[in-house]
Amino acid sequence: MGMRMMSIMFMLVVLATTVVSFTSDRALDAMNAAASKKASRLIALAVRGCCSHPACSGNHQELCDGRR
């Protein structure tokens, strides 16, 4: 292979690596956002459950804000 062909092959490999890396990052960001949203919902459910029990809400007044 000539020097020109090797340069073209190198650029194609770099381009392919960049495209794969970019799409992988976007997919990972979407998965992280979904996991974060699910965790937030689970935490909210746990706090609501705690606030409905007098003993738990008494220990965690900063979370329950006086509601039961």
UniProtKB/Swiss-Prot annotation:
Residue numbers carrying Aspartic acid 1-amide: D65
Cellular-component GO terms for this entry: extracellular region; host cell postsynaptic membrane
Xref: InterPro entries: Conotoxin_a-typ
Subcellular location(s) of the protein: Secreted
Signal peptide: 1-21
GO molecular function, one term: toxin activity
Region (Ser-Xaa-Pro motif, crucial for potent interaction with nAChR): 52-54
Propeptide, chain numbering: 22-48
Expression tissues: Expressed by the venom duct.
Keywords (A to Z) from UniProt: Acetylcholine receptor inhibiting toxin, Amidation, Disulfide bond, Ion channel impairing toxin, Neurotoxin, Postsynaptic neurotoxin, Secreted, Signal, Toxin
Annotated S-S bridges: C50-C56, C51-C64
The protein's role, per its UniProt record: Alpha-conotoxins act on postsynaptic membranes, they bind to the nicotinic acetylcholine receptors (nAChR) and thus inhibit them. This toxin inhibits mouse muscle alpha-1-beta-1-gamma-delta (CHRNA1-CHRNB1-CHRNG-CHRND), and weakly rat neuronal alpha-6/alpha-3-beta-2 (CHRNA6/CHRNA3-CHRNB2).
The family this protein is said to belong to: Belongs to the conotoxin A superfamily.
Free-text note regarding domains: The cysteine framework is I (CC-C-C). Alpha4/7 pattern.
Additional comment: Negative results: does not or only weakly inhibits rat neuronal alpha-7/CHRNA7, alpha-3-beta-2/CHRNA3-CHRNB2, alpha-6/alpha-3-beta-4 (CHRNA6/CHRNA3-CHRNB4), alpha-3-beta-4/CHRNA3-CHRNB4, alpha-4-beta-4/CHRNA4-CHRNB4 and alpha-4-beta-2/CHRNA4-CHRNB2 nAChR.
The protein, known as: Alpha-conotoxin Lp1.4
Organism classification: Eukaryota, Metazoa, Spiralia, Lophotrochozoa, Mollusca
